[in-house]
Amino acid sequence: MIVEERMKTYINSLDMGNTPFLQELEAQALANRVPIIRRDMQSFMRMLLAVKQPKRILEVGTAVGFSTLLMCEYGPDDLKITTIENYAKRIPVAKENFRRAGRE
């Protein structure tokens, strides 16, 4: 659909790239087949964070913590994120990634 393609083009034009830590985490997640948000949604999320300046976010599905750390990086300084994960094997991985990023 034309409108959908225009929207994707616009969202992709917003891509500023990520911090080196997020780039590394994204590469590890993809190599280990852990689902994380696609690049176009990363750009869209950064735009929403800039426009809305949320104070609180509830994230359902932490996985390795990539989206949480993306929101921490690009959200306002006083942003509080609560993230939940039901797959027990991923919880320690996410906690370690939060520690490594200095976002415990």
What is each of the regions a protein language model found here?
Residues 1-104:
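A short alpha-helical cap/connector motif
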